[in-house]
């Protein structure tokens, strides 16, 4: 079952994009992330959401245990403050 992790925090879209690009450069093929999307709340400027997609919950947990992910998480906390996580099992996807 596919799994999505939503990260919600305050910062700039540019900083969030740079953070993901740095993670991609460092993690390379080690990461289990399949897709990452950065979104900015139109109604609350500076409020960001990152939608991180995995093939499964198990892959997400493996990814969370990687040293590169732990380091990136520490850097994100120092850059963006508290990050709120939502952990979602994908039940169905509809392509329109």
Predicted feature descriptions by range:
Residues 1-68, 79-96:
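Short S/T/G/P-rich N-terminal loop/turn motif that feeds into the first structured element of a domain
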């Amino acid at each position: 079952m596919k799994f999505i992790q939503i990260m919600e925090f305050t910062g700039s879209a540019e900083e969030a994009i740079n953070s993901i690009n740095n993670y991609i450069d460092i993690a390379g093929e080690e990461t289990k992330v399949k897709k990452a999307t950065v979104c900015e709340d139109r109604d609350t400027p500076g409020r960001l959401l990152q939608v991180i997609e995995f093939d499964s919950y198990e892959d997400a947990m493996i990814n969370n245990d990687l040293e590169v992910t732990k380091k990136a998480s520490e850097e994100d906390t120092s850059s963006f403050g508290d990050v709120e996580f939502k952990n979602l099992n994908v039940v169905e996807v509809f392509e329109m």
